[in-house]
Amino acid sequence: MKLILTVFSLLLCFLLPTSEALARPKIGLVLGGGGAAGIAHVGVLKVLEANHIPVDVIAGNSMGAVVGSLYASGMSVAEIEQVSKTLDWGKLFSDDTSHQLKSYQQKQQNADFFTVFESGVSKRGIKLSSGLIDGQKLIFELRRLLAPVAQISNFDRLPIPFRAVATDIHTGDAVVLKQGNLASAVRASMSIPGLFAPVTLDNRLLVDGLVSNNLPVDIARQMGADILIVSNIPPDNSRKLDTALDISLQSMDLLVRKTSEAQLASLTPQDILIQPPVGEVGRLDFTRVAETVALGEKGARTQLVALQRLAGSLSSDANQFATPAHPIDEVVKVASVQIENDSSLRESILRKALNIKPGDVLDNQRLQDGLNRVYTLGYFSLVDYKLTQLPSGDYGLKVIAKKATEGEHRVSVGFSLGDDFNGDTRYQAGVKYVQKGLTDSGTELRAQAVIGRRLLAEAEIYHPLGIDGTFVAPRAWYQEGDANSLDNAQQVAKIRAREARVQVDIGHPVGNSGEIRAGVFHQKTKPLPKDGTPIVADKTLTEAGVKLQYQADTLDSINFPTKGGQLTAAYTRGVTAMGSDNDFNRIELEADRVWSVHDKHRFIASGRAVATANNGAAVLDSGNNLETHALQTGHLVFSDNAPLIGNETVAGSVTYMRQVAEIPEIAKVHVGASVGVSQAWQQRDAVDLGGLRNSGTVFVGGETPIGPAFVGVRKTQGADHQAYFILGRDF
């Protein structure tokens, strides 16, 4: 019996932890909110890791929740630092979807000049979003970063147990987030009131935890922490209160200070408080990430003696405290797909966009792509998801598509201004109204009106015929605008053209970048000569017939693209039996291509050609653009900013552009130069490529809140040098 007890005792000595291990206190890490200044937490983690200090539980708020969740997911400090330095924070805090990811219809809608202001409207008036930013890009990025633990719904099962803090906006109570989707929890924790839209989780409307508990010391203690390491971002007491934003941020700092005082007072002598000296880093200053991380390290080193004392009291085995590795990704097989949709769109449209079916094997990239396609339908402010493991081991996917808070009636305003500093000042101002959801298939009414150098009144109904994307689009417009007409490449007639057109198209999308249309049209144009001898008869011209058109857009940006291109190819058949003055055939080609070299150097090649057969009348314009497209970018601007048009037209340009500076949070500044040629003829017999007119321009340009802005000098063959200024996207 004694022998058995002896052997059993020896086995216990080998199998059970030592008394030192059993007695090791649990270390809790508390990371407070602080906006961009909260990135200093990464520097604090670097010092903890360098001194082999383990972290057993983490509680964080706002930016502290972001950094804390990444660390809790198993990401190393080096990886977190790399992420913080390489993320485009400016894009994350914008809801504008990448131009490349939009459908062709959305690209067309967003390429006009109605960019100054947009809101929803209702019988009660203007309907604004519940936040300046809905946060769709942010939640996508959080999903990507936290993908390795996306299937873990209990935050105690993370490599390091974690809690995020948010605030119930109805009651003001702190809400501890300990289960669900980790990315959604973090997003809720950083929903700064007024800046980010609130997040609904478990039927509670949540905003940033700064309102109730910015420094969740008590939460870490509730998780069982014996010793706390607290990284607190102190308020900026030196901020100049010059602007409304300064006042708003100062008000939030005062609120944060009040909610943090009680938490700081609860710290014990064995707890360690770290306060990074980030006073000069603004709450929205994401351009100083590397500096902010270094300030976090600096703040942690002020407590280096206490940290090293803690490390020495725990264990001499550094490897024991290494950050847990990422969990191995599970193969997620989807057994069911539910869609929670509160918009007017029928569910089948969302399912087609999602493109995930029961039985599919799901990876994070495919899921994100599907959610993004649903978001870009244009009806939603946020598209989130939940994955729930079923008893079978497979997963149920639930997609939550939250309709846009501004509703389905949208109004947007546009404005542009141009000046040649020689008495020719032009402006355009307009309003656009879009009513979505006329039917559950996504029918839209689109109407717009513009005044200024060009007058326009237009209405279109866009009606999808099925979920495959086929649509019908009746359209009518009236417009007035300036144009040039050339005879034998010599004489210029300056014309004010009045145009009325009705058109009915049937079309189909070509992938995500293009569209093909076929339709019938009837157009009347009244040319009114302005200067010079007119070469078109002073009578109403009628064109009627059929038109086939293909358009594609693969640009990555509408104003300052770095890659991709645009293409328009159209065939028009004029038919006298349909009311046209002449039977004619016309082919139009227009293309742009962008190449980048070493990131900041770009080359843009543009060309346009029109060829017409069997038309004795002068052609004014067969599209919806009497003003020059080149005015939108300033690359190819002719003497009076009106396009050269005729039965036979050739134009081309090559542009070099380089980004030379960046004004933080405002604009990227570009310089560039362009050379081009163009000419138009009314008769094919008169075509002479030797008579092409040369032109050139140099410019400085950049983005502004209402569109691109350019200042430059242009030179056209036979004309003097001319300075010009353009603000906003022209129509």
Task: For the regions a language model picked out, list residue spans one by one.
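C-terminal outer-membrane beta-barrel translocator/porin domains of Gram-negative envelope proteins
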Residues: 376, 396, 408-420, 543-669, ...
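Bacterial N-terminal signal peptides
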Residues: 6-17
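Outer-membrane beta-barrel and related beta-rich outer-membrane complex signature
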Residues: 243, 484-488, 525-532, 579-581, ...
